[in-house]
Design a protein with these regions (language model features):
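A short alpha-helix capping/helix-coil boundary motif
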Residues: 53-56, 119-122, 151-155, 217-222
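Nucleotide-binding/hydrolysis machinery
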Residues: 132
Length: 234
């Protein structure tokens, strides 16, 4: 379930910018699926077996627009109404607005909150993910979920070669995870995927904030889809 198309978080590495997704508008120009709550209710009303409903895989459910449109909240209300479970992935502490609904879903079925943590360094975070709350704010959101007995999972991704692939960064994030009592950590290796559309944007941001880094990527990985290293930098 993806309620929006496009994103305003501005993450420099975002795979969803890729041309393979055939987005016909600017990535920051958000397409809104305004009838999503109606379609969701129709589908859940007819479903004979309960299951987990997932959201956040392609577009964050807590974009800036959500503050006014409240599409995500309306869908959570429907999920809670029909007794279904929820798995929700976000980078935003706006999820705290809906903690009351998340608690009710957890009480009646199952609710798992997944949150992406990329870098322990707050200054670096504001470059890599400029228009969303920082890692420390996300850690605070995880702590709130812990206090409400809502299980959490962290996506430790992506690990960008030469940027956040340090032992210090990984230890910092793992300490956050341990302290917040997360139930699982997902990591897809030491690297990032780049393809047409997102590669060009990523390289432009490297030129802007990390002069010379693009050339280091080109020397190390060429045009490879997977840009990964086998070792962290100490």
């Amino acid at each position: 379930m993806n309620l929006y198309r496009g994103c305003t978080h501005g993450c420099i590495y975002c795979d969803s910018r890729s041309s393979c997704y055939q987005m016909s508008h600017d990535f920051e120009d958000i397409a809104v699926k305004g009838n999503a709550p109606m379609l969701l209710e129709e589908a859940l009303r007819k479903k004979r077996q309960l299951c987990m409903i997932g959201t956040g895989s392609m577009c964050d459910p807590y974009l800036h627009l959500e503050e006014q449109l409240r599409l995500t909240r309306r869908c959570l209300e429907i999920i809670e109404k029909y007794g279904f479970g929820l798995s929700i992935l976000t980078k935003s502490d706006r999820i705290l607005r809906d903690v009351d609904l998340l608690c009710r879903i957890q009480e009646n079925a199952k609710c798992v909150v997944q949150m992406t943590l990329t870098t322990y360094d707050e200054k670096l975070c504001r470059i890599l993910e400029p228009h969303v709350c920082t890692t420390r704010q996300r850690y605070h959101a995880l702590k709130v979920m812990q206090s409400r007995h809502i299980p959490t999972v962290v996506w430790l991704s992506p690990i960008l070669p030469f940027l956040n692939d340090t032992e210090q960064n990984l230890r910092g994030i793992l300490e956050y995870c341990f302290d917040a009592g997360v139930k699982g950590i997902l990591c897809f290796g030491m690297g990032v995927t780049l393809r047409e559309g997102d590669r060009e944007y990523f390289y432009a941001q490297l030129d802007k904030y990390f002069p010379g880094m693009k050339q280091q990527y080109i020397r190390s990985f060429g045009n490879a889809y997977e840009c990964s290293l086998s070792l962290i930098h100490i």
